[in-house]
């Protein structure tokens, strides 16, 4: 940790190779880091921006469904992913939530239902009905277990019911 700016260029595989026409988007990230003028690192693992949320003080929120998905980095387990986060973004602590909401084709991106609103505050969606209620309750329970350890304030936000267009 020298305090100097640098970038991390994670690999992008279109959310587990779901969209062949978007696989080329990985090149866009390479162009961004190259044109930024700052040194950059390439860990060589798949990670999309919405798969993690960081509080700025070394704490990451993520889901097992996303980062441990075999369509991303089948050769990595939880411990190895934590090592990458510690090494490349100086985040030694990770709160692993279970999974994301139904119908999310990104395989459980955290940014669909939980975010840091400050370094010590987490907003998390909840629903008392519908298909997302059980997983949101499970994720809330995991946050509750972690809040004292990390000194977090938790706030629930109601998740609206899905709207389907015909």
Where are these predicted regions, by residue range?
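The feature marks the mature, well-folded catalytic cores of soluble enzymes
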Residues: 1-166
